[in-house]
Amino acid sequence: MKFGKRLKKQVEESLPEWRDKFLAYKRLKKLVRLVSSSSGDVGGGGGGEAEFVRLLDGEVDRINAFFLEQEEEFVIRQRELQETVEKVAGGGGGGRRPAAAEMRRVRKEIVDLHGEMVLLLNYSAVNYTGLAKILKKYDKRTGRLLRLPFIEKVLRQPFFTTELISRLVRDCEATMEAIFTSSVATTAMAGDRRTWKGCSGDAGMAPMADQQGIFRNTVAALATMKELRSGSSTYGRFSLPPMAAPASPESDVLQSIRSDPHLKENGRIPSLQFFYA
């Protein structure tokens, strides 16, 4: 699949409020097409190249701003969620068992946060790859060597530095594993399974229709990151994002969510519908 189509697919599968935050690849590609390798202006490194670099710099600044904003939000949410998990696990300090609704809410928040952080890792990977691809096209068309110095600059950009988000994802997965398998959670949810099985019609289907998207998008993002890092012969040494790979779509933590017995209804496993009930 060509990168332009892959990017379009990723934008469509991303969160609605993120869709205008991705690299303006189509606009950059259009500008590259207007550039002629025989143009004295561009060949001399004049206005044509300056315009292209200005657009690239603007895109990098925009991507950085969004990435840093989301990263800061996730740090805060992760800290608050950990405090909530500890409170629920301890029965709020009063020795009581957490209610099923309370445990569902915590599970939902964990899954949402994990999914959104994986989407941010994917956002970094896709935008980095887009920059590398468009610079490769530019150099090929103009005969210039802009890609190497520009990518070296990109390597120092905040959106390219994903160690913090990768660590938050791993921490979140550890919390997910603990909360999904704890005896406290199992006890809290046991009675609620009977209530869930009694749901039918619109009341039973609404949670699935409203909330299953985050899990689907997360798995799609993981698959894309795996593809981008697969070492395709069309990619150069700068084309792979240097991130610590999060869980794969087949990872234990994601499979444990999908295979949770609470999710099984009429022989199928609706994505996360129980946790969003």
Curated annotation (Swiss-Prot):
Subcellular location: Nucleus; Cytoplasm
GO annotation, biological process: cellular response to cold; cellular response to phosphate starvation
A Pfam family annotated for this UniProt entry: SPX
Highest taxon, organism lineage: Eukaryota
Residue ranges of domain SPX in the record: 1-152
Induction: Up-regulated under phosphate starvation. Up-regulated during cold stress.
Description of the deletion phenotype: No visible phenotype, due to the redundancy with SPX5.
One Gene Ontology cellular component: nucleus
Matching InterPro entries: SPX_dom, SPX_prot
Cited PROSITE patterns: SPX
Keywords from the named record: Cytoplasm, Nucleus
Tissue: Predominantly expressed in roots, leaves and seeds. Expressed in root epidermis, exodermis, sclerenchymal layer, cortex and endosperm. Under Pi starvation, also detected in mesophyll and phloem in the vascular bundles.
Assembly behavior: Homo- and heterodimers with SPX5.
Chain's role: Functional repressor of PHR2. Involved in maintaining cellular Pi homeostasis when plants are exposed to an external change in Pi. Negatively regulates root-to-shoot Pi translocation redundantly with SPX3. Down-regulates the non-coding RNA IPS1 (At3g09922) and suppresses the responses of miR399 and PHO2 to Pi-starvation.
Name this polypeptide is given: SPX domain-containing protein 3
